[in-house]
A protein has these predicted regions:
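Alpha-helical structural context detector biased toward long hydrophobic helices
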Residues: 1-4, 8-286
């Protein structure tokens, strides 16, 4: 049973680590900048678990423990391999103008971005996954299950409902899940990889951003996700054809704009901002 469950995988965070393996972290709530290890950040105890409530103690503490953690782990090897390939290609000047991902890799990349968004505790809280919707216990099928569990002296019907809600949200293998639908939506957009030479991108405890501030047109879709201090991923429906699935060089002065987007969001959504170098955070927060 995994107690400390990461919502940002360590293979991703390590891309933003300094030479000593530490990540510079700005805690917006405390107003402090400090260095820490990737294994100690972006995690919560039993984040993806559902506790049995009003249930037979023989069932244990959690409903199907570690199921989501195991599913994430199955894909993270594939995600990590692709991410390192992208970083390697984008870092090589010889690949300027080259196509970065093939069809299967585009699918994997969209799955990864969706996973990063949906498994985040803020996203899960917005979806009320740990709440039983009013009236759902009156649904005939739920009543039948509840009666059966009571007869078997198991109980815990509401816990099963909560677990099912998480599966619909997180499970890529569940037909019609949010993970499936989000991946499909991203595949319907064009992507490009923006690169910076000297200034650095930051990332955060909520790295995937949908839409960029009030200047973004309502009909324009933009998804921003930093992959590395010098490489970020953009999805959109208005990207120029010449950068589709290719590298686009970002003017250095525009990097501050992207980094500041995290600082504009509420602290409960983005409490921590991460960077490879302390000076990048100091400039951002001053």
């Amino acid at each position: 049973m995994t107690k400390k469950q990461h919502y940002l995988p360590q293979f991703y965070l390590k891309n933003f680590a300094s030479d000593n393996g530490k990540i510079w972290t700005y805690d917006r709530y405390k107003g402090k900048i400090y260095a820490c290890s990737p294994r100690d950040i972006a995690c919560e105890k039993y984040l993806y678990e559902t506790r049995w409530e009003d249930a037979n103690p023989k069932l244990g503490e959690f409903v199907l423990p570690n199921q989501f953690e195991n599913k994430f782990a199955e894909r993270e090897g594939e995600y990590s391999k692709l991410l390192q390939k992208i970083i390697g290609l984008c870092s090589n000047e010889a690949n300027k103008g080259a196509l970065i991902c093939n069809k299967d890799e585009k699918e994997t990349l969209a799955s990864f971005v969706s996973n990063m968004y949906l498994r985040n505790p803020w996203s899960m809280a917005q979806a009320n996954l740990d709440c039983v919707t009013d009236g759902i216990m009156d649904v005939e099928e739920i009543k039948v299950i509840d009666n059966l569990l009571q007869l078997m002296e198991f109980g815990g019907t509401e816990s099963l409902v909560k677990f099912a809600s998480k599966r619909v949200w997180l499970d890529e293998d569940f037909d019609g899940s949010m993970q499936q639908e989000s991946t499909k939506d991203l595949r319907g957009l064009k992507c490009c990889f923006i690169k910076t030479e000297t200034k650095q991108f930051v990332t955060s405890s909520f790295p995937v951003l949908h839409g960029i501030d009030e200047t973004t047109a309502e009909e324009e879709k933009i998804i921003y996700f930093p992959l590395h201090p010098h490489i970020a991923l953009l999805y959109g429906n208005t990207l120029p054809h010449k950068v589709w699935n290719r590298i686009g060089v970002l003017p250095e002065n525009d990097i501050d704009f992207w980094n500041k987007q995290y600082y504009k969001l509420e602290i409960d959504q983005v409490r921590f901002i991460y960077a490879k170098e302390k000076s990048v955070l100091e400039k951002l927060v001053k």
